[in-house]
Structures are given as structure tokens and as C-alpha cells.
Amino acid sequence: WDTMCSRSADLAAFFNANPSITTDAGAVLFGDTVTISADGPWQHLLYKLTGRKWGNLDVENETGCGIVPYTYKPSNLVNAVQWAVGLELLLLINDPWRVFLTTDHPNGACFWRYPEIIQLLMSADFRNECMAKLPAKIKSRITLPEITREYTLYEIATIMSAGPARALGLLQKGNLGIGKDADLVLYREDHDVQRMFSHPRYVIK
């Protein structure tokens, strides 16, 4: 754990040079969540590391899964690096049509916390406020403090809807073309981006 650091810049450079690749970000947010994995031995190790509850079970004798509650803490250096990595990938990959907003729900964070990630992507000032709460020695291990990019609303719509739909071949989804599925979410404009995306005015399907 002492050598834990981000290599997102290297991954993003490779990604940007290879236009045939798509990826999801698997972002992490601080706070309580539950980890679920088919890697039973790792879940047992996580249980040992945290001292939290643990459950492992077989699924139809073909595979298994482990479940362990977990808290990502900004004061924890490893957790802080994990938090930075997902944001770095989203910000350093140039083409929003090929990188998708996810949290590996619920492992990294629950999907209903996406508005928090959206605010982190759209506001460099908010990112800086959050980074100020991290351990001082993290700055040599991550790239995030050097990134000034801020997402536009168009780019947010792309990584959340249009991009995934195109990558999956769901031609009826993710766009407003004639004859396409009219799945719409309308928001009341608000300078607080996290609040705006947390409280849609209308959801139309």
C-alpha cells in the first residue's frame, strides 16, 4: 500500500492514441457503501483489513460472491488515490463518446450519487475544495491537482447517455432523432450542479 499511486495519465494517453477502445470510469466516492465481488478470497481479505461484517456464498455451485461493508475515507491515502483515479480518467480521456460515467455500483459508490461526480467534473473549484481535505502527501501520487478541464453539459449528456447507447448499439436510445425513444429528463436550472441533477423536474419515458 505504501507505493499506491495513480497511473491514470499513462492509461489515458494510451486510450487517446487508440480510438477503437471504450471504457467506463468506475469512479469512487467517499462514504459508506457495500462491496460485492465474485473474488471471494479478496472479500475475505477486505473483511480482515476492515474488521467489518463479511458474507460469502456459492451461486448454483458455479461461482461465488463475497459481500463486505466498506467506508471510503478522505483521510485514508489509498482511498484518496482511488477517488482521484476515476476522476482523472474521465478528465484526461479526450473523447467523451468513449468513456462512460459509472461507479461499479455499489462497490465504488451507489449510482444515485452520480450528481456529486457530475459536479466534480464540471467544477475545478469544487475539485480543489475536495482535494484540500486529502492527506498532504497524496499530491505526489496523483495527477488530479494539475487538471483544469471542466465538463460541459453536452459532455455530461454524452458520458451518461449518448455515448453508452452508441457503444452498446442501442440505436433507439441516447439521442433526440426522429422516431427514437423519447426518454427525457428535464431539470430546473440551478448554479448548484449537484443539487440540480439530484432533483429532476420531469422524467419522461
Predicted regions and their residues:
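Short conserved micro-motifs at the rims of enzyme active sites and ligand-binding pockets
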Residues: V34-S37, W112-Y114, F197-S198
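C-terminal cap of metal-dependent C-N hydrolases
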Residues: D181-K205
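Active-site core of metal-dependent hydrolases
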Residues: W1-L90, D95-G108, F126
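His/Asp/Glu-enriched, well-ordered alpha-helical/loop segment
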Residues: T63-I67, N76, W83-Y187
